[in-house]
Amino acid sequence: MKVALLSESPADEAALRVLVAAVLRRPLDFVGPGYRARGWPNVAQVMPAVLRHLHFNTDADALVVVVDADDSVVHTAEHDRPGYFHPHCRMCRLRAVHRQTTRRFPAINGRERVLRSVGVAVPAIEAWYLCGR
């Protein structure tokens, strides 16, 4: 499986490589250098360009996007209801960016679209690093 990463920093990308491989429990090829943004707002801004690049110019299977929640609204089960969107929830916003960007992508190289996985670390990704301690 070929996976691309989009995160807020190089340190986050390094940790994500280990985390994604452990979660998926399968051999992974990471697509090029990770795609990085500087902070939360930039992740949402560059994500459409990253998705277009991955879909049309690579054979990536998935894009993993991780941002910190910081003080934003935390995603809850209520947010998963059909048609529901919370404008201050980072998970809702990133899912919407993916949906709006990829909805008109044609099938290419035998795949419908690049899959996505979005993680919002609460309160920050450093908390994930401490999991299990």
Please describe what each predicted stretch is.
Residues 1-61:
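Short, surface-exposed loop/strand segments
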Residues 68-133:
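Activity-critical C-terminal alpha-helical subdomain
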Residues 6, 33-36, 64-68, 117-121:
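Extended hydrophobic secondary-structure segments that form protein cores and membrane-embedded regions
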Residues 54-76:
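Extended, charge-rich low-complexity interaction segments
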